[in-house]
A protein has these predicted regions:
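Short gly/ser/thr-rich secondary-structure transition/capping motifs
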Residues: 1-3
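Active-site-adjacent pocket-lining segments in enzyme domains
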Residues: 9-216
């Protein structure tokens, strides 16, 4: 599918995946997929009742940062590009008069989850990392509260979140994208399905963090 066709079908997409590679040229020329990323996030702000996810792998997060998607959120990227991401975040914050992104060193980072976390002191899955590149608060995994399956989603709550509740997932280096993909399988299908995928792949799922909420 080319970019022109992607724009035509954008309203039908549930997940937009942004891989890394070639980011310097894209940012310098302000070319695609920067416009596509922005258009996808604008769709969510206009129609927050729909559940959508933007998911970057490796240096793809630099493109999300350049598009202004990560302002005020937490995110990660390939560790060799932390300094570059900080630089982009600073430039974008000045350009858009927006908050900076909090860059943390994790396998993956998930923002704008479906349900409120509640009191983090009562949840053993919330942790404060003192050894991260920056201190970060997040919960390992995606299944801390099974009772959240009974919660009713609120469109009003989703609309009040940044980007209209667009779920934003950034992952580190290439294999971190596998871990983040397993997270997506767990929330969109089931934890059991994600576990079965790891069995078939003979892969150990290394979980990242989720920020200020839960998905299941």
């Amino acid at each position: 599918m080319d970019i022109k066709e992607a724009y035509k079908q954008l309203n039908e997409f549930d997940i937009l995946v942004i891989p890394g590679g070639g980011t310097d040229a894209i940012i310098k020329s302000k070319s695609e997929p920067l416009g596509l990323i922005k258009a996808f996030s604008d769709l969510q702000k206009k129609h927050p009742e729909r559940e959508r996810t933007v998911f970057s792998i490796c240096t793809g997060s630099l493109l999300l940062a350049q598009a202004g998607i990560l302002s005020g959120l937490s995110a990660t990227t390939h560790p060799d590009f932390f300094a570059k991401m900080e630089k982009i975040n600073g430039e974008v914050a000045m350009r858009d008069l927006a908050e900076r992104c909090d860059v943390v060193e994790e396998r993956y980072v998930v923002n704008n989850l479906r349900f409120d976390l509640g009191n983090p002191e009562e949840n053993p899955y919330v942790r404060r990392k003192s050894d991260a590149r920056r201190p970060s608060m997040g919960r390992k995994g995606s299944n801390a509260w099974k009772e959240s399956n009974t919660r009713r989603e609120s469109n009003a709550r989703r609309a009040s979140l940044r980007l209209g509740g667009l779920r934003v997932i950034t992952s580190g280096g290439i294999t971190c994208g596998l871990d983040a993909s397993l997270y997506l399988v767990s929330i969109m299908v089931s934890e059991e399905a994600a576990t079965e995928v790891t069995r078939l792949m003979q892969y150990t799922w290394n979980k990242g963090i989720v920020v200020d909420g839960i998905d299941i």
